[in-house]
Regions:
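Membrane interface segments of multi-pass transport proteins and intramembrane proteases
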Residues: 2-3, 179
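Alpha-helix boundary recognition
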Residues: 12, 37-41, 123, 206
Length: 220
């Protein structure tokens, strides 16, 4: 829904931004998240959707080498809302009246849809108290929350992919094939895998790409 959360310095230097949606790697259309890791080795350019427009990002020749040097693993990270899982007793917000499942919608009247945006917004309120707008059981309530000097609320967030999907943050793609169609789909998958395999070999054996440094693999 909201693209990917980008904080890896190599990706940022290459021109990626949080919110980008990956549309294609080279000439290969990307429809599923798992395909990014499949095609990123050998990638020369990536097409993203940003603010409703398509943008082509040309990758540096040693892109994979840079990622390996940085120890990059989680490159394109999912974005999700801020849902409360629990509040530890040691937190200054332990008595704020939060409950598991509370969806924090914003701070001080400002709507904030994604958790990564909360992280940056809280930096403006170090050591202060903020009013949080919270959705609980289809009702909106307000709670005062304390931000510590490290710009944190000390609240454990809930990570629930199923719930995020139900809320419309993620799309799950399921393809059903008939018996006959499965052969065609299998052949296309085989051909795509073979082409991608040789593309990866070409990148790995080209010293300029430094792809050999990332033989351990990357997680998109």
């Amino acid at each position: 829904k909201g693209g990917y959360f980008i904080e890896d310095p190599v990706l940022l230097d290459a021109g990626f931004k949080t919110g980008d949606k990956i549309l294609a790697i080279n000439d290969q259309s990307i429809k599923m998240d798992t395909e990014i890791g499949q095609y990123i080795i050998g990638a020369e350019q990536m097409t993203v959707q940003r603010d409703g427009e398509q943008k082509v990002i040309t990758l540096p020749e040693n892109f994979l080498g840079q990622l390996s040097d940085e120890g990059s693993k989680n490159l394109f990270r999912y974005r999700y809302p801020f849902i409360v899982e629990s509040v530890p007793d040691s937190s200054a917000n332990a008595s704020a009246g939060l409950k598991e499942g509370d969806l924090i919608l914003g701070l001080n009247g400002k709507k904030i849809e994604y958790f990564d945006l909360f992280q940056s917004e809280l930096k403006n309120y170090k050591g202060k108290t903020v009013q949080a707008e919270i959705l609980r059981e289809n009702k909106t309530i307000i709670r005062d929350l304390k931000v510590n000097n490290e710009a944190k609320l000390n609240i454990y967030r809930l990570i629930d992919a199923k719930r995020f999907t139900e809320m419309g943050y993620y799309d799950v793609i399921k393809t059903d094939y008939s018996f006959g169609e499965s052969f065609g789909a299998g052949a296309r998958k085989f051909n795509s895998t073979v082409v991608n395999y040789f593309s990866q070999l070409k990148a790995i054996f080209n010293p300029k790409t430094e792809a050999y440094k990332g033989l351990g693999g990357f997680k998109a």
